Regions:
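Membrane-embedded alpha-helical bundles of multi-pass integral membrane proteins
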Residues: 1-252, 278, 283-284
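Intrinsically disordered, polar/acidic, low-complexity terminal segments
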Residues: 251-266
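Membrane-proximal soluble helical/coiled-coil segments
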Residues: 263-284
Length: 284
């Protein structure tokens, strides 16, 4: 199964031109959904206004070269390794899901449009590996890591609109693997049997994934790198996202600036500890 291109057998029923057109339509839906999401939530407007506010409060000018370095650091940290996740389990789950999705989508495009650089067997392996990684990371997240399930007592089967993205992603990968397995054992999409059923479910889940961008969390993957980069620039220029600085409460200069500190906390305030980060939120 892992060495077989599932779209080869499918081409006997659905032409390659139709499959290619379907991918183009899905790409257009993602682009259109992202733009509509951006207009509806005014996220781009927020980023520009916040950037302008940070620029007014900046204590130094960040050079173009330094910004380029910050962009590279953002890609290497927040994008490639998802370092923004404090939980190791959540981070590993996200990396499985993210790279599985990238491999699955890229291999799908190359298998359908054709590629001379890689053999069909290699791309088929990448396609199946990507779908498997998606299932590992996605189901791990859905049943064990989701904050509302893990920490807030919500049952895993209680659904809401925010779950469209992860559920359509999971069902796409799951039905793709089942369809490919049945087809590799001699099943035919046109026989109106189980192979047809799971191919149809795969098609519905895949279409839902790419056509509901405006209502799902799909678009957030495009905004997260921009937000992470903006945060690094804000720390570099001293504006600190318009948040108060990290003061030493025992410093005479700080106490002179904020006289209520010695009045209510004394001249040598105690370390208040980790606060909310004292323990992981594993109860509700």
């Amino acid at each position: 199964m892992f060495m077989t291109n599932p779209f080869d057998a499918l081409s006997a029923l659905i032409s390659t031109d139709v499959m290619q057109m379907y991918i183009i339509v899905m790409a257009v839906l993602v682009a259109g959904g992202t733009i509509l999401d951006m207009l509806h939530k005014k996220s781009a407007q927020y980023f520009f206004l916040d950037s302008a506010k940070n620029a007014k409060n900046a204590k130094r000018t960040v050079s173009t070269g330094e910004k380029a370095g910050l962009a590279v650091a953002t890609i290497a940290s927040e994008v490639i390794t998802s370092s923004e996740f404090c939980s190791t389990k959540r981070r590993i789950s996200h990396l499985f899901t993210m790279y599985g999705f990238i491999l699955f989508v890229a291999a799908s495009g190359l298998l359908i449009f054709g590629c001379d650089t890689f053999s069909t067997e290699t791309l088929a392996q990448v396609w199946h590996t990507g779908a498997t990684m998606l299932c590992i990371g996605g189901y791990w997240f859905w049943f064990f890591i989701r904050v509302d399930v893990n920490s807030e007592g919500v049952k895993w089967y209680q659904l809401r609109r925010a779950d469209i993205f992860i559920l359509s992603l999971l069902t796409t990968a799951t039905f793709a693997l089942i369809w490919s397995n049945l087809q590799s054992k001699g099943g035919v999409v046109g026989d109106m049997g189980s192979t047809t059923l799971f191919f149809g479910l795969f098609l519905i889940a895949n279409t839902t994934l790419f056509s509901t961008v405006m209502w799902s969390k799909f678009a957030h993957m495009f905004f997260k790198p921009a937000a992470a980069f903006q945060k690094r620039v804000a720390h570099a220029d001293g504006s600190n996202l318009n948040l108060p600085g990290d003061f030493d409460l025992s410093s005479p200069e700080v106490q002179a600036r904020f006289p209520d500190i010695p009045e209510y906390m004394g001249k040598n305030p105690e370390d208040m500890g980790a606060g909310i980060r004292r323990e992981a939120p594993n109860h509700y």
